Amino acid sequence: MVENSFCKKEGSPVVGDRINVKDLTLAGLERLLTGMGAERYRAGQVAIWVFQKGAESFREMTNLPANLREKLDAAAVISRPEILAKKVSSKKDAVKYLFGLPDGQAVESVFMKHAYGNSVCVSTQAGCRMGCRFCASALGGLTRNLSPGEIYDQVLGIRRDTGERISSVVLMGSGEPLDNYDATLTFIKNVTAPYGLHIGCRHITVSTCGLVPGIRRLAREKLALTLAVSLHAPNDRLRDILVPVNRKYPLTELMAACRDYAQETGRRVTFEYALLAGVNDRKEHAEELVRLLKGKMPCHVNLIPANPVPERGVKTPSRLQVELFKKILERHGLAVTVRRGLGADIDAACGQLRRKIAVMGERLNTRG
């Protein structure tokens, strides 16, 4: 394990009286360095060291003058990820990580191997306040937002641990990305930049449970990001229960925002639909889903056989039920996939490993 020096204040790029450079964009680095009397181009050099090469100290930045490195050491820090726990799937196609934060919180990330490359699923918040019924992340509520650097460190930490190239990122771990909008956008700008990992926007997926103002704000950025909407129900009555934010932003508003997003960005919208046994997986639900989506916008439906969450009473549907649901959608012309089951044996659903470790800690403390 390495020493951790993440941001200690929510929403602030300051560690004590020093700035965490991973919380800054290139423009922010330029302001920092020119304020030290350095030339503007030095910011690009620092950015490459930090966001692309994964440098953990300013001493590594050998193309910077020694006096500038000393000034950076005095005014700034480079946060470093600390792996608290790691679980590898039996098929070796997924690795679940639990990263520690300096305030004692922990966040989850998942490394996934696909035929087309390697992807990382990152968290944007410690916990979540959206309260989705089937999600383990929401069980403890929201603790705090992550800083841009804390999000970025999940990617760098996994890259360092696996030695693998990361070709795509999904913001689909613990938390609601659009509920932590500014940090999410800063992370995206850095990870897609030439000075960062240079991952194309089309290979970045932003997941949301349906925060309509956030979707509209993201559309105005005109970035070719993939928007993944956690739909999970074809009508307001059921969605009000499964995804409580629907009570504030019902399906009519959500669908309108999604149509506008597709129009503004030229990207089709992905609708995530977690199939919960006996809850939303029946024939009538599939037919309602067709009526909701067909012909409304360029879209794709991703069916997700739910991971069991005993605390929520969530059960996984049978393979036959999943296939029947899929065939109904396909018969009506919708583009459908069933998410490949990566990491079910490593608690890869949102919040499961974090909660399991926390419960273990509580038991140990009780015994002590």
Swiss-Prot record:
Enzyme active site: 108, 350
Disulfide bonds: 121-350
SUPFAM superfamilies: Radical SAM enzymes
Pfam families for the chain: Radical_SAM, RlmN_N
EC code(s) of this entry: 2.1.1.192
Key words, A-Z: 4Fe-4S, Cytoplasm, Disulfide bond, Iron, Iron-sulfur, Metal-binding, Methyltransferase, rRNA processing, S-adenosyl-L-methionine, Transferase, tRNA processing
Primary residence: cytoplasm
GO cellular component entries: cytoplasm
Keyword S-adenosyl-L-methionine carried by entry: yes
Enzyme class: transferase
Radical SAM core domain boundaries: 114-345
GO molecular-function terms, A-Z: 4 iron, 4 sulfur cluster binding; metal ion binding; rRNA (adenine(2503)-C2-)-methyltransferase activity; rRNA binding; tRNA (adenine(37)-C2)-methyltransferase activity; tRNA binding
GO biological process, one term: rRNA base methylation
Binding site for S-adenosyl-L-methionine: 175-176, 207, 230-232, 307
Record-linked InterPro entries: Aldolase_TIM, Elp3/MiaA/NifB-like_rSAM, Methyltransferase_A, RlmN_N, RNA_MTrfase_RlmN, rRNA_lsu_MTrfase_RlmN/Cfr, rSAM
Record text on cofactor binding: Binds 1 [4Fe-4S] cluster. The cluster is coordinated with 3 cysteines and an exchangeable S-adenosyl-L-methionine.
Annotated catalysed reactions: adenosine(2503) in 23S rRNA + 2 reduced [2Fe-2S]-[ferredoxin] + 2 S-adenosyl-L-methionine = 2-methyladenosine(2503) in 23S rRNA + 5'-deoxyadenosine + L-methionine + 2 oxidized [2Fe-2S]-[ferredoxin] + S-adenosyl-L-homocysteine; adenosine(37) in tRNA + 2 reduced [2Fe-2S]-[ferredoxin] + 2 S-adenosyl-L-methionine = 2-methyladenosine(37) in tRNA + 5'-deoxyadenosine + L-methionine + 2 oxidized [2Fe-2S]-[ferredoxin] + S-adenosyl-L-homocysteine
Record localization: Cytoplasm
Requisite cofactors: [4Fe-4S] cluster
Comment field (misc): Reaction proceeds by a ping-pong mechanism involving intermediate methylation of a conserved cysteine residue.
Primary role: Specifically methylates position 2 of adenine 2503 in 23S rRNA and position 2 of adenine 37 in tRNAs.
Cited PANTHER family: 23S RRNA METHYLTRANSFERASE, RADICAL SAM CORE DOMAIN-CONTAINING PROTEIN
UniProt record similarity statement: Belongs to the radical SAM superfamily. RlmN family.
Annotated protein name in UniProt: Probable dual-specificity RNA methyltransferase RlmN
Species per Swiss-Prot/TrEMBL record: Pelotomaculum thermopropionicum (strain DSM 13744 / JCM 10971 / SI)
